[in-house]
Amino acid sequence: MTRLNRLLLAAFTAAAATPHLFAAPAAPAAPAPPARLPEVVVRANPIHWPDPAAVAAALARPLLETNQPLTEVQDYIESRLPRLDAPRSKGEWQQTARELRRDTLEKVIFRGQARAWRDAELGVEWLDTIPGGPGYHIRKLRYEALPGLWIPALLYVPDNLSGTVPVVLNVNGHDRNGKAADYKQLRCINLAKRGMIALNVEWLGMGQLRGPGNNHGAMNQLDLCGTSGIAPFYLAMTRALDVLLAHRHADRKRVGVAGLSGGGWGTIFISSLDTRVTLANPVAGYSSFFTRARYFSDLGDSEQTPSDLATVVDYAHLTAMMAPRPLLLTFNAKDNCCFRAGHALQPLLDAATPVYHALGKPGALHYHVNLSPGDHNFGEDNREAFYEMLGHHFFPDQPGYSNREIPSQAEVKTAEQLAIPLPANNATLNSLARDLARNLPRREKTFTDQKTAGAWGPDHRLHLQMLVRGADLAVSAKHIAAGEKDGLWTSHWQLRLGGDWTVPVVELAYGVPKSTVVFIADAGRAKSSPEIERLLADGKRVLAVDPFYFGESKIASHDWLFAILAAATGERPLGIQASQVAAIARWGRDQFRQGPVELSTVGPRSSTFGLIATALEEKAIGKFERKNPLTSFKTLIDSNRSVNESPELFCFGLLEYFDIPQIELLVAPRQIVTR
């Protein structure tokens, strides 16, 4: 290091109260850098391309504690989850349950086109009857969950029925065999042999409905269009109940639902919200959102974590909403998938028990823990617990009723034997989203040119902010370190944003910076040296930022599941990211006093929330530069992208009003440069 550079470094270190590089003081009381420092540096070190090794080393320095991004997102989510208070009276709870049920249906499930799906006249087609086994037969059918989406199903019917009998809807989870899974067939067979009508339905994405179009992560494509992605899952179950209850021998007072895993989720979801269900047995299917935030195995995928569900209810609420109807909670002691009994069961019992007591039905709440085999199963032990539950509540006076499994393995059919013809163009989650996206954004709600954007800019900007849940985050800056090597000046920061997030920022300058640019990349700052070197060589001060979900701020495990869980609380990951970028831009403008900062992004994801930040932050962000940007949200649907690939891009309702071109118009007259 030259003597001059040693003097400059000493001066730089002495200015610790103003640790940013070559900037005017942030406040009058702070000491300014040496008056002639920039000119001296220029003469001593004419601008060259910065040393790549030095840039890479500065960018690679860790600024956050281990697991800090995880801890912060867990705390953020938990602070937004609804809590269940014990009811003070029977009447109070009944009113609460009615309101929760109404709000969940209206504000979460039946949004957008889902309302029309709910009210549509739909078909049921009865097909072949095949032999079952001693005492029962199987009727094949298909029914529409919503227009164009047919669900294959099997109805197990006892022979020689008379009068009315209990009916049971059997749903299932992530088993590629779907309705042909042997343990599901055995359950339906045993129900029929006990005199009940059992409906075995296929689940979206499984069995005959397997395929990329029904990947559960595709349901968020519907969310993007402003229609609830959870609606097809819910409607598939309500229509199944319609089919069951239309049977002339159905007893409407004895209506059960049971299922494993995703079927356990389906069981509590439909049973808590559809009061036609009079008994439910969810098996290893769910836990409270509070539990999920701390136990990664319980972080359910898209249907378990629909957008905005936790603005109304937690799964503890749904459990309590079964009261006073009989409920059997079944969990497995050594579950090798999810929802292990040791952590999942007790919070649900704690929530539901006071409600069952308040309603005078403490004996209607049951639980069962499977010890052998204890893994993720609805095996014989769990099935026998279910049969016992049915006997207790549906056949209390039947002498000789037994909960013992009736051996029926020889009657299990192959998937081919149980196959049901489906239309070649049967709808999928993806095809439904394609149909919706075709006419979006809605023309009467959007704008197409700079003139109309300018006229309605403030209104559209506010609407965009509301859709992404944008927030004005206060910034508290903590300076970590500063240094110089071969003319490259670096300063490391932690920026505390809104009291919730800590975002790492690396400040770099080579020579005299003529402007400040905030840089963000999908790959993270540490893998973006060439792009940052280019900006430095162009005479810019670079603030290399890793916002929520990227680079050093990336959650080490299950990251996309935490992102959709944040969306379930009513927040939007896209808005979190855009708000962080906007806050850092304001900080950079005020800190360095060179006017509005520029924003440079690399990658389709960072370019999208960077564009939104630029549209919303008119004063602090000037020029917006992007490389490899997303050109339309419709490409996510056309290419059948799943939410796990880029969860922030599936922001509920955004495409209904804004595509990328409309957001770009809100940036005008500021410059957008695409590389």
Show where each model-derived region lies.
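Positively charged n-region of N-terminal signal peptides that target proteins for export
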Residues: 1-6
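Bacterial N-terminal signal peptides
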Residues: 9-20
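Boundary at the C-terminal end of the N-terminal hydrophobic targeting segment
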Residues: 21-29
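Alpha/beta-hydrolase-fold serine-hydrolase catalytic core, especially in secreted/extracellular enzymes
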Residues: 28-150, 180, 315, 323, ...
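Alpha-helical segments flanking ligand/cofactor-binding loops in enzyme cores
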Residues: 98, 189, 268-269, 320, ...
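Cap/lid segment of the alpha/beta-hydrolase catalytic domain
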Residues: 162-246, 252, 286-296, 514-591, ...
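Primarily recognizes the serine-hydrolase "nucleophile elbow" in alpha/beta-hydrolase
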Residues: 194, 240-311, 584-657, 663
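Alpha/beta-hydrolase-fold catalytic nucleophile elbow
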Residues: 202, 258, 283-284, 330, ...
